[in-house]
Amino acid sequence: MEALGSGHYVGGSIRSMAAAALSGLAVRLSRPQGTRGSYGAFCKTLTRTLLTFFDLAWRLRKNFFYFYILASVILNVHLQVYI
């Protein structure tokens, strides 16, 4: 959260809370589950890739959607999930 016109962030703990939430999500999603099926390795790779893109977007202060599209074009990463 940024104070209007100041260029400084309000509440220094927001960044650490977001990092802790992201770390917790990564740990929870990387745990093996009994009913993962044949897509287990793919889901793990997909999760790591999305978390990596989110982390880079967070560090560079960019919108995740635009960063994901740019990274997909540059790295030719196609994340397709069969539903």
Swiss-Prot record:
Listed transmembrane segments: 64-82
Predominant location category: membrane
UniProt-annotated location(s): Membrane
Membrane topology classification: Single-pass membrane protein
One family name in Pfam for this protein: DUF4560
Keywords (A to Z) from UniProt: Membrane, Transmembrane, Transmembrane helix
Disulphide bridges: none
GO cellular component, one term: membrane
Descriptive protein name: Small integral membrane protein 10
Taxonomy of the source species: Eukaryota, Metazoa, Chordata, Craniata, Vertebrata
Gene name of the encoded protein: SMIM10
